[in-house]
A protein has these predicted regions:
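Predominantly cytoplasmic-facing regulatory/coupling regions of multi-pass membrane proteins
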Residues: 11-16, 21-127, 152, 157, ...
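Juxtamembrane loop-to-helix connectors within ABC transporter transmembrane domains
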Residues: 1-9
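Re-entrant/interfacial helical elements at transmembrane boundaries that shape
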Residues: 132-147
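Alpha-helix C-terminal capping segments
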Residues: 147-149, 161
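Membrane-interface helix-entry/capping residues at the boundaries of transmembrane alpha-helices
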Residues: 1, 156-159
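Short amphipathic alpha-helical coupling elements at transmembrane boundaries
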Residues: 3, 72-75, 143
Length: 187
């Protein structure tokens, strides 16, 4: 079970680093001083993210023996599996950002790649805050960075709808299916 958790966690972050690195390098989104980051732009962060994803693939290509951690062996994914991890997680991050992008009010000058840079920066801020789901932090960064493209009240409605679609709806469906499963299991 621990191996699966580590594999999934690694996949989650590899996708974030790969798509975040790519978008950050291509978009050159400025970082507001309010966020107190050591960089004025996301470009250096993008380079670091791409280096991490590349280093992972390189390590998986060079290492043949399982890693030993705390007396347990972790198998090394093959190169196709490593690329699959990155691809699947990157697509997941892209879809997540695209859901919010589609919900946003029409804005001139806001391209999908530019929005993805903003979205991923907001997601990173939310994750680094250690607040469950980045609740409030994610929305604040989105509002701050998209305020030049749209009215904050319209953005807030889109953010609320995004939370509903991407978090609450899957939870409700899963809860319903679990309840049905439990009821049928008792019969």
């Amino acid at each position: 079970m621990a191996k699966l958790v580590i594999f999934c966690l690694l996949t989650y972050w590899l996708g974030f680093f790969a798509i975040g690195g790519t978008v950050f390098v291509l978009e050159h989104q400025n970082i507001p001083a309010v966020l107190h980051l050591p960089f004025a732009s996301v470009w250096p962060i993008g380079v670091i993210f791409l280096a991490i994803a590349g280093l992972y693939v390189l390590l998986m290509a060079l290492r043949r023996r399982p890693l030993k951690v705390g007396g347990r062996e972790l198998p090394i994914p093959s190169i196709p599996v490593s690329f699959g991890q990155i691809a699947i997680s990157s697509v997941d991050w892209f879809i997540s950002g695209s859901v919010l992008y589609v919900l946003l009010p029409a804005a001139t000058g806001l391209t999908c790649p530019k929005f993805l840079a903003i979205f991923l920066l907001a997601q990173a801020a939310g994750m680094l805050s250690y607040i469950p789901g980045g609740l409030g932090v994610f929305e604040t960064v989105i509002l701050l960075l998209l305020s030049e493209f749209s009215i904050p009240s319209a953005l807030l409605g889109s953010l609320l709808l995004y939370r509903l679609i991407y978090y609450i709806l899957p939870l409700a469906v899963a809860s319903f299916l679990l309840a049905v499963h439990e009821i049928l299991a008792r019969k």
